[in-house]
Regions:
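Intrinsically disordered, low-complexity polar regions and short flexible loop motifs
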Residues: 130
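The feature captures the short pre-catalytic strand/loop hairpin that immediately precedes
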Residues: 23-32
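Charge-dense polyanion-binding interfaces
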Residues: 147-164
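Active-site-proximal N-terminal segment of extracellular/periplasmic enzymes that hydrolyze or transfer
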Residues: 135-143
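A generic structural signal for short coil/turn motifs at secondary-structure boundaries
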Residues: 32-35, 134-136
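C-terminal cap/loop subdomain of S1 sulfatases and analogous C-terminal strand-loop tails that border
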Residues: 1-16, 31-32, 38, 43-123, ...
C-alpha cells in the first residue's frame, strides 16, 4: 500500500509525499469540474478566504499568505511563482523544479519507513520529468541551483514579517 502514489518520501519528509496535499475547490455556480496545475499553498488560505469574505488585511498581518482566489476559481492556471516548504530542511518548488536545501539530518526514519530528504548536498529535481524525485540533477544545472538558493536567501532575509 502506497497512499502517496508516485511521490517519494512520506509524512515529515522534504520530498513531495511529505508536503504535497490534494486541494479541492467546489463552489456551485462559480467553479467547473477540472484539474488545475496552478501552484498554491495551504498558507494562502488566510489571504484568499479574507478576500472572499471581504475582509481587508494587510500584508503584515498575513505574512507569507497570498490571495489565490483566481487560481481557486480556475481563472489563473499559474498561481504562485514558487512555494517554500519546510520539513527538517527548506525547499523551493516551482512548476518545473524542486530544490531541497542541504541538511545533515538523518536521511531515513526507520520507525515510519520514510525517506526524509536530508542530504548534505544540494538536491534539484526536474518535476516535469521526475515527479517522484529520484534523479538529483543539481550537478548538471548549477544556474537553476543558484537561482533557487537565491530565492531561499531572499525569503529568509524577510524574517517572519510579523510581531508575535
Amino acid at each position: 500500500h502506497k497512499p502517496w502514489g508516485p511521490f517519494r518520501g512520506g509524512k515529515y519528509s522534504a520530498f513531495e509525499a511529505g508536503t504535497r496535499v490534494p486541494f479541492i475547490v467546489n463552489w456551485q455556480g462559480k467553479t467547473r469540474a477540472k484539474e488545475s496545475t496552478a501552484l498554491v499553498s495551504q498558507i494562502d488560505m488566510l489571504a484568499t478566504l479574507a478576500r472572499l469574505v471581504g475582509v481587508d488585511i494587510s500584508v503584515k498581518e498575513v505574512a507569507d499568505s497570498r490571495d489565490q482566489l483566481n487560481a481557486w476559481l480556475g481563472h489563473d492556471e499559474k498561481g504562485r511563482d514558487y512555494i517554500i516548504g519546510a520539513a527538517s530542511t527548506l525547499t523551493v518548488l516551482t512548476r518545473h523544479w524542486k530544490y531541497i536545501e542541504p541538511n545533515n539530518g538523518g536521511s531515513y526514519n526507520p520507525l515510519t519507513n520514510t525517506e526524509l530528504g536530508n542530504d548534505p548536498r544540494d538536491q534539484l529535481y526536474d518535476m516535469m520529468d521526475d515527479r517522484g524525485e529520484y534523479d538529483n540533477v543539481a550537478g548538471g544545472n548549477p544556474l537553476v541551483v543558484r537561482f533557487m538558493k537565491e530565492i531561499l536567501r531572499e525569503e529568509k532575509a524577510k524574517g517572519i514579517g510579523m510581531e508575535l
